[in-house]
Amino acid sequence: MLYDIIKSLRKILLLTLIYVFFASFAFSEEIEKDNIFLIDDAPFDVHKSKIEEIQKSKTEYDSYGFRLKESITSTLPSDEECINHKRPVYLLDTATTRYFEKGPLDSFHTGFFYKGSLPISMIQGGVTHTDYTQNNIENHFRGYLKNGKTSFNISTRYTPRKDLDFFQFLIGDLFVSHQLTQHNRIVFGNSRTHTGEEGSKPDWQVPLISYSQISRNFGNIRKFGARVVGEYDLVEYDFGGYSSDSYFREFFPRVEFTGWVNFKPLGKTNGKYGDLKIGGGISSGHNNFTYNVAGAYARYQYKKFRADFEFANADGYNGNLGLSKKHARGLYTTVYYRITPKVELLARYDFFQPDLDVSKKDIKEYVVGLNYYLKGQGLRFMLNYIFRQSDFGNDSHRIILGTQIML
């Protein structure tokens, strides 16, 4: 009897193995075609509008596993996506983005930003020294709602500052943006004020390793408030009311107003004569004392050539380096030439008078730079040479090697 039971079990086991063997052939090709993630892990909920796009762009894999080259190619953005240097390029965005089929959230993007430099400083009549600088280490989080009009941005920063504690400097962007009309949106939260044209740009968009002197003194600052941002063919504007505090040091000490308008006279010519932008604005507020910053900006771009100019005058200011009662003034002008789609050569003259109430002494910086955009702003290598003439000390030379990575 025991022999008959064992014989029956052997038949059942044999039939099971035969079924599994043939079933694997029957379904393997169908699973391989439909599996948009190309791995056996349970997939996330993906928004339906994205599934077809992912399926069409996916790379086919054989039964022996991943092909490393094809896997990397399918993950990284294409060169066409990296041409526009005004937009961020997160190299791993396709891998770090989650899409949602249910709920109000359409997609959630997680990014990483790093910008570091290695400066070699040579002071005339002094010593030469080299030090490594971590300009930025940040996490970026972006979410988009299904209504197609609302999004939110959060950024956290991990490079310490001596004048701030860790948590004061930790939060960068913390705002919600809503598209009111086709050309206008409202922004509420902690965001960059439009104090100057370059001073309103994020660090990854600045063409050189460092901001200009007026931008790093008067601008490059976030404050908590509400903004209305508009963009048309012939004009763009940014008006905002904010708390005059920065870095969460005080709760609403007083109010600051910042407004900036750019006119684009060639906006209706489709680039036939190039792109011309002329504008200006003010930033005025009170925090223990009243401060006012006024500026003007001009830029012209034609094919591979671009040039810009910015001037600012401050009777007190509240920028990245803190509050100051000083009367300061400065300007910069930059010339750019795009040698190839990935290589850019630029030169800048930067002039700054830090305290006109005391003297008209100034600091001049002559900068030559080379940018190599291997993957747009997502992977950029920079080389800057700076000759600095200062009425406050010895002149100096600096050679700076920089790297920018967005993942």
What are the functions of these language-model segments?
Residues 336-382:
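Outer membrane beta-barrel transmembrane domains
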Residues 103-107, 144-150, 260-355:
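Detector for outer-membrane/organellar transmembrane beta-barrel domains
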Residues 99-121, 130-246, 253-258, 262-267, ...:
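Outer membrane beta-barrel
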Residues 158, 170-172, 243, 255-257, ...:
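Transmembrane beta-barrel architecture of outer-membrane proteins
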Residues 259-261, 368-374, 379, 395-407:
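Outer-membrane beta-barrel "beta-signal"
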Residues 15-24:
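Bacterial N-terminal signal peptides
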Residues 26-114, 118-122, 407:
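N-terminal periplasmic/intermembrane-space "pro-region" immediately following the signal or transit peptide
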